[in-house]
Amino acid sequence: MSKMKNPRTFEEQTECIVNSLLKDFRTPLSHAANRNLSGADEPCSGEDYSFDVAIIVGRLRILGDQFNGELEASANNIIAVTIGGQAGSTVLNDTVQSLSRTWCTQDPTLVFERAFLAVSVKLLEYVVRKAPNVARQVANYVTGMINGNTAIREFIQGQGGWENLES
């Protein structure tokens, strides 16, 4: 895969990260174990820039794995709405907000924005596995949802940007 220009804006970085998550979730486990994370497969890496999408994706996957709540029914609803051509982005946002609030209620030490990112990642992973035909559309919704949420953006930027986000 050829290298893209380095993502400079928050929006470009988010798009790059979500696209890389999508690719990562679509990669069979046998291939994922053998891939070269620092090589030419990095669509958004660069020699003169500290943005390493493979590290960020790894951290987000770890973060998503921390969510062990029930999301099957919610994810299936997102899939159905997306397939039906309805407002999937609205349903996704409402679902992520609701699941994140529930998780934070169960664990008062959890920061809402961290829960929001974890739930978003976990829902995307579920959609990729259960309905790969709508995964790209849901990934676009996730990108828009993160980019359009001021609190999430400020949380990530407050950490020093995507490259400093800890799992």
Curated annotation (Swiss-Prot):
It comes from Mus musculus (Mouse). InterPro entries: Bcl-2-like_sf, BCL2L15. This is Bcl-2-like protein 15. One of its GO terms (biological process) is regulation of apoptotic process. Gene3D superfamilies: Blc2-like. It comes from the Eukaryota. Disulfide bonds: none annotated. One of its GO terms (cellular component) is nucleus.
